[in-house]
């Protein structure tokens, strides 16, 4: 999946001679949005888009995602022909309320924890910290314990308790590797420290990629199994994202944290910080990882897309779904 990000305030998206361009502020500089782009992420509140540019983008299958200052998607423009089949959604509505939904929720949490283990092992090797291997073992034991439980006795509270136990050890490890100047003490999406804000912004980009993949696979992003369904809340998108957070966002931000200068302006990341975070996360989405299901190394964005289709297929056929386990 190819993504183009617009961060600069005052940018205009226009159509010229069949091409879609971004014009930055008052300058005459025009940047062509390549025609093979899948998604344009608009990450500034002061960007204008012409209706002609929207029409041309729609014909090319390009959608626009708008992020708020925290990086959360708040709106999306996409072509009306994404996926016209209703079979997947009918199965989704029928299966998610019973045993299938509980099994799927368990698999999502299990996969999230396993991918956290993979990142901690990678960091242990990268930072040459033997103590991190012990942390990886502790988190892996939580995943093993969860794996052994009968899904029929699981509810959301039990699953969240496993996720919380793993997260405590995981985020303590991440915090120990970061400079004290960032003020990061653990994951809190409401915290105003620099690294939590960078994580929020990176996750916002990941949300937009995952939601697009689910929509194109024919799934309803608003009916999930782990996050409580609520009007206007993309519960399935939030569920699906959980499996990819560690590898897609946490990894690139942790290993590049000393290369980027994060700064706050008016209680939010400034423009340069958002550009840096977006660049790092998007570059990582183009990196190849071993996708356990296929035993092949593929671009992370393609793995996300492929896994959404696999989830849709399993739901449509009533088959057991296996999460997106990755190897760095």
Task: Indicate where each model-derived feature is located.
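An N-terminal structural lobe/cap that precedes and organizes the functional/catalytic core
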Residues: 27-28, 36, 58-61, 65
């Amino acid at each position: 999946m190819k993504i183009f990000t617009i961060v600069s305030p005052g940018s205009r998206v226009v159509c010229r001679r069949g091409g879609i361009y971004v014009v930055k502020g008052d300058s005459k500089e025009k940047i062509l949005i390549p025609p093979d782009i899948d998604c344009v992420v608009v990450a500034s509140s002061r960007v204008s888009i012409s209706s002609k540019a929207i029409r041309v983008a729609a014909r090319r299958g390009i959608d626009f995602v708008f992020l708020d200052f925290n990086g959360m998607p708040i709106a999306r423009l996409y072509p009306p022909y994404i996926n016209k089949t209703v079979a997947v959604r009918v199965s989704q509505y029928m299966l998610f309320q019973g045993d299938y939904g509980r099994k799927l929720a368990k698999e999502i949490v299990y996969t999230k924890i396993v991918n956290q283990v993979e990142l901690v092992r990678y960091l242990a090797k990268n930072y040459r910290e033997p103590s991190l291997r012990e942390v990886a073992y502790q988190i892996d034991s939580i995943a093993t314990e969860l794996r052994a439980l009968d899904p029929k006795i699981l509810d959301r509270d039990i699953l969240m308790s496993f996720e919380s136990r793993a997260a405590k050890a995981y985020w303590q490890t991440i915090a120990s590797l970061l400079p004290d100047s960032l003020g990061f003490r653990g994951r809190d999406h409401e915290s105003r420290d620099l690294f939590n804000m960078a994580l929020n912004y990176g996750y916002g980009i990941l949300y937009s990629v995952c939601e697009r993949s689910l929509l194109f696979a024919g799934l309803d992003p608003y009916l999930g199994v782990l996050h409580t369904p609520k009007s206007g809340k993309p519960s399935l998108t939030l569920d699906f994202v959980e499996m990819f957070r560690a590898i897609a966002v946490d990894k690139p931000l942790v290993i590049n944290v000393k290369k980027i200068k994060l700064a706050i302006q008016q209680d939010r990341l400034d423009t340069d910080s958002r550009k840096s975070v977006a660049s790092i996360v998007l570059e990582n989405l183009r990196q190849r990882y071993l996708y356990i299901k296929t035993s092949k190394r593929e671009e992370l964005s393609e793995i996300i897309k492929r896994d959404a289709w696999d989830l849709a297929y399993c739901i449509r056929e009533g088959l057991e779904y296996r999460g997106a386990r990755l190897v760095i």
